[in-house]
Design a protein with these regions (language model features):
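Transmembrane alpha-helices and their membrane-interface boundaries in multi-pass membrane transporters
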Residues: 398-412, 434-453, 460-499, 618, ...
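Transmembrane helices with small-residue packing motifs
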Residues: 15-16, 23-57, 119-128, 380, ...
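Extracytoplasmic/periplasmic membrane-proximal domains and adjacent transmembrane bundles
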Residues: 9, 51, 122, 168-346, ...
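Hydrophobic transmembrane alpha-helices and their membrane-interface caps
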Residues: 30-34, 346-413, 471, 867-954, ...
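Flexible hinge/switch segments at interdomain interfaces of large molecular machines
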Residues: 37-48, 85-91, 128-151, 179-185, ...
């Protein structure tokens, strides 16, 4: 490198270098202890949820009158990807998903636009629709969850204690929000005997009117004096059960209290709403979310202190137990990865001492903490937390960051062995290595560009990978220029008068012969390498496909779905039976149950499901990952045996963006009937695939309904109408909300119903008396034809089309992604080709996300290739040399694919990233070799000798750096997330380095027609 020799400058100003070394190490240690901690990196969930309810409407009616107009309006959302909706009897849930290309800085603007669109449509919805409501905080993570339990305590007592705790936890540092779970709403029921009501000549509507008037909050005005304003407050609101009982009722000349003629009781709502249990005990949950930028470990300690205070104040028998403890999980995860990082440092240092010798190894060992600490400073500056990706990336970069230092140290050592003094050796190392090392470093960093600049949720999840590794590589180059020469000048030792040839030992002689053979038979070597490469690429379809593996976390997410239309009471009984079976099983440490609802998002990689009475969810926490699978399998077997009508599915937490089922295929069509028909055919074909299990559709079977065809003429003659009859039936069967009671911070509905009628059986429906006006009651069967039918109770839609998802699980050794590809490309190929126009079958779930992510990952690849070629061109200055170096890039695929194939590791996101980056590292080695050939030619050597001696001279540093790179990856092998990358890197780099050292000379000699001596 021409110009100022920075190595010489550093040696002459080593006190300045020492100062910065101390400053960097000090700043790095401070940064490390002040970095945020989390288990997984944050990524933006670009989804908002719109909900609405229309009591009494069927799924078909609410789809047509509410879901469809809202979806059409929401199609105007800027940056919209797709809309998915779930419509059930009386309610609809619409998921608005934005494109991954929408910057997270614009998300709040998009949510505001969605609110405006929904508000614009609100006035056009039918009267009686409640909502729509918008939840744009769907990505809130409640990492710390507690359960308040206690035998002998009512739900209301537990709620009050939980509410007090909630208020105190809200003030804890780093707490963003605290929510209560499993709270049972109370309701006041005013029940009257139907005959007694008739004897007073009263109609239900008369009672409604009195309760509504008495319970309404109305302003009574304000008196304005000269000095102040005085508000008038009217007492007598219905704020207690006693005040309701004392409510005066006047019928004609008779007066009495409501409590004299009606039963007034306050109880929990019937039927119950979503329920929570912990270890089988009824519970009220307290869910805590962390503020943005907070530290999980600090939050965990603060919460622990506050909860201990609360426990000491609770009455005997009431307990607070921890359900989810994300700070503890983060602490364990950080500890494991920090241990792996230290292991990698020790391994790399040991390899350095063995390969370079003690004194040279000392130099390298001192360079490592400087670069690592500088990386911590960069991470703190950029706001990159410590998590699975950033720590794993540091381990990955650890092997790479020593490459430049090894090259400089090895070159100084060689020059000292050749007789140069220390300063001259450092100057020669800088002159010969600085520029090619910089080019190689930039090329290696460029290999990771697709990760740093790809769009999409997955790329956002692993985005820190590029920034951490690129900064570490550049910092390592700076350290090799300034720190390595100074430390080498101080520590490297060579025995006085000792001069060793670089070709002295046996390894060099063997390598010399191999190079000579490759040059002699260069065409054979080139063709053979191309054939091996082609054969390896042909193996790709036989390598398992899995974009992100399951994590080692002990949680099992168990979803249990009863037949559509099942009551929450039945779901509760089934979940209680499962809990009884788990109680006492020492393989599990705890389990929390959610009936009629889903667990909150306790980690970012978990998607809550829409509430449904027929659905129950259980989060089982196994004692450790070793017994996790057996606990899952035994629980599923128990459910299949004891509850054959229930459909159970257990999944583990993945190490990437989640999917509900491992295998998902989505069928969309024009109308509900045909879509359901084709989906059943597809599901039957999927079920026939070998090893498939638990195949189901998210479109449940039809549910029974009672249809009443009212005789309009007869009803009108009797003084009634459809509305009055519907309301009367609602009063009898469910209870009609007529007013509200204000009790502290609780709003308790007041409902009116007739005594005993809630227990009516279907068989008695025709004889059920209904009010038709003027105090008259007639049997329902006299004014209506009663029929029993089945109807679709749930409708899923995607982009306005009815959509059914076929789900399942793969058995055997094949990964779910591999099975989906085979199902789609082979099993269902003929089925897809014969679908009518307007009907499509698409991949869904994890593989859809993975294919989309691969497309995003591929988008920046042309930029990556251009930058690599540009750097090559500036460094080598000749197009033929650029082509030779570029050709070697794909050679890394040979070892990478073979390693994945032989070890049965899946090809997924991180392994694809590894292969892209591997190409940059292989090209880097080629640059070093080609640059050395150019230097030897400039020194006047013959072309053949220049090639041979350059390969031999660079053999040691290239192999040393590759071996240390490989050893640096070893601590990543135990991690399911990083294992595919580590395996592909280890195999790919070792084989590519060996092949590159032989193929590059052969390519060079073939192009430039360099021939060696015949005797060689």
């Amino acid at each position: 490198m021409k110009g100022l020799n920075l190595a010489e400058w550093a040696i002459r100003h080593k006190q300045i270098v020492y100062f910065f070394i101390i400053a960097i190490i000090t700043g790095g240690l401070w940064s490390y202890f002040h970095l945020g901690r989390s288990e997984d990196p944050d990524f933006t969930i670009r989804q908002a949820v719109v909900t609405a309810a229309w009591p009494g409407a069927s799924a078909q009616q609410i789809t047509q009158q509410v879901t469809d107009p809202l979806e059409k309006k929401l199609q105007d959302t800027k940056g919209l990807d797709y809309i998915k909706s779930f419509t059930h009897d009386g309610k609809t849930v619409i998921y608005v998903n934005l494109k991954d290309s929408v910057p997270k800085e614009e998300m709040q603007t998009r949510w505001h636009e969605i609110r405006n669109l929904v508000n614009d449509e609100w006035g056009s919805l039918p009267s009686g629709v409640m909502g729509p409501y918008i939840n744009d905080r769907f990505d809130d993570v409640y990492g710390s969850i507690y359960a308040v339990t206690g035998d002998g305590f009512s739900y209301e007592e537990k709620r009050k204690y939980a509410e007090n705790i909630r208020r105190r936890l809200t003030g804890v540092e780093d707490v963003q929000k605290v929510e209560l779970l499993g709270v049972q709403k109370q309701e006041i029921y005013v029940e009257m005997d139907q005959n007694k009501l008739a004897s007073f000549g009263m109609r239900p509507s008369d009672v409604f009117a009195m309760l509504q008037q008495q319970g309404a909050m109305m302003p009574a005005g304000m008196i304005h004096t000269d000095s102040r304003n005085v508000a008038i407050r009217v007492e007598g609101l219905l704020d207690t059960v006693e005040s309701l009982k004392e409510l005066p009722i006047h019928v004609g000349e008779r007066s009495f209290h409501l409590g004299d003629v009606a039963s007034v009781t306050q109880m929990y709502a019937d039927p119950e709403t979503s329920l929570m249990y912990f270890n089988g005990k009824p519970a009220v949950g307290i869910a805590v979310s962390m503020a943005p930028g907070g530290n999980n470990l600090v939050l965990g300690k603060n919460l622990e202190k506050e909860i201990e205070k609360e426990k000491s104040e609770l009455p005997a028998g009431l307990d607070i137990e921890q359900v989810a403890d994300q700070p503890s999980v983060v602490n364990d995860s950080i500890h494991e990865f920090t241990k792996s990082l230290l292991e990698a440092i020790v391994i790399v240092m040991a390899a350095s001492f063995l390969s370079l010798g003690f004194w040279s190894g000392i130099v390298l060992a001192l360079c490592i903490p400087v670069v690592v600490c500088a990386s911590f400073i960069y991470m703190k500056w950029q706001g990159i937390d410590l998590h699975i990706v950033s720590l794993g990336t540091l381990i990955v970069s650890l092997g790479l960051l020593v490459d430049d230092a090894i090259i400089v140290i090895e070159m100084m050592q060689v020059k000292l062995e050749e007789g140069m003094d220390r300063l001259a050796a450092a100057q020669a190392a800088y002159k010969g290595c600085a520029k090619p090392m910089l080019a190689g470093t930039l090329i290696t960093a460029a290999g990771f560009i697709p990760v740093g600049f790809a769009a999409g949720q997955t790329a956002e999840y692993v985005g820190a990978f590029f920034w951490v590794i690129a900064s570490t590589l550049l910092l390592s180059w700076v350290a090799s220029i300034f720190v390595s020469p100074v430390l080498g000048y101080r520590f490297i030792r060579v025995k006085a008068g000792e001069k060793k040839s670089a070709f002295a030992d046996r390894a060099y002689r063997l390598f010399y012969k191999a190079i000579a053979w490759c040059i002699r038979f260069k065409k054979t070597v080139i063709i053979g390498t191309a054939a091996i490469f082609a054969g390896t690429v042909a193996l790709i379809p036989f390598v398992n496909q899995e974009f992100f593996p399951d994590s080692v976390r002990p949680e099992i997410i168990l979803d249990v779905n009863l037949p559509s239309g099942a009551s929450i009471k039945e779901t509760k009984e089934v979940m209680a039976g499962i809990a009884d079976n788990l109680y006492g099983d020492n393989r599990g440490s705890s389990f929390s149950t959610y009936v009629g609802d889903s667990a909150p998002r306790f980690i970012l990689l978990f998607d809550p499901l829409a509430p449904e009475d027929s659905h129950g969810q259980m989060i089982l926490v196994a004692r450790d990952s070793k017994v996790r699978d057996s606990l899952r399998d035994d629980t599923l077997a128990f459910i299949a045996e004891q509850y054959p009508d229930a459909r159970a599915h257990a999944r583990l937490i993945t190490t990437g963006p989640p999917a509900e089922y491992p295998i998902m295929l989505r069928l969309s069509g024009k109308n509900v009937e045909d879509t359901a028909k084709f989906a059943k055919e597809a599901a039957a074909l999927v079920s026939q695939y070998p090893g498939m299990k638990n195949v189901s559709m998210d479109w449940p079977e039809e549910t029974p309904v009672v249809r009443l065809k009212i005789d309009q003429d007869k009803v009108r003659k009797l003084g009634g109408d459809n509305y009055s009859i519907s309301r009367d039936l609602y009063v009898k069967l469910s209870g009609y909300k007529v007013a509200e009671s204000y009790q502290g911070n609780q709003l308790v509905p007041i409902s009116f119903r007739l005594e005993g009628s809630n227990a009516a059986r279907l068989a008695d429906l025709s004889s059920l008396p209904v009010h038709v006006g003027s105090g008259r009651y007639v049997p329902l069967g006299e004014i209506a034809d009663i029929s029993y039918e089945n109807e679709t109770s749930t409708i899923w839609r995607r982009d306005l089309h009815p959509t059914i998802t076929i789900r399942g699980e793969a058995g055997g050794d094949k990964t779910a992604d591999s099975v989906v590809n085979e199902l789609y490309d082979r099993t269902l190929k003929d089925f897809r080709e014969h679908l009518p126009d307007g009907y499509t079958l698409e991949k869904g779930g994890a593989i859809e996300n993975s294919e989309k992510s691969v497309q995003y990952l591929a988008a920046p690849v042309p930029i990556m290739i251009f930058l690599i070629l540009m750097i090559l061109m500036f460094e080598l200055d000749k197009i033929p040399l650029m082509v030779i170096a570029g050709i070697t890039g794909p050679l890394g695929l040979i070892g990478a694919i073979l390693s994945l194939f032989l070890t049965r590791q899946p090809m997924g996101f991180v392994s694809i990233v590894g292969m892209l980056a591997l190409s940059g590292m292989v090209v880097r080695n080629s640059i070093i070799l080609l640059d050395q050939i150019r230097q030897h030619l400039a020194d006047g050597k013959k072309p053949y000798d220049a090639v041979i001696e350059s390969a031999a001279l660079r053999f040691r540093p290239i192999m040393l750096s590759s071996v240390t790179d490989v050893l640096g990856f070893v601590p990543l092998i135990p991690s399911p997330f990083w294992r595919p990358l580590a395996v592909s890197f280890i195999g790919g780099l070792l084989l590519a380095t060996a092949i590159g050292l032989l193929v590059v000379p052969a390519l060079y000699c073939w192009y430039y027609k360099v021939e060696g001596p015949k005797a060689s």
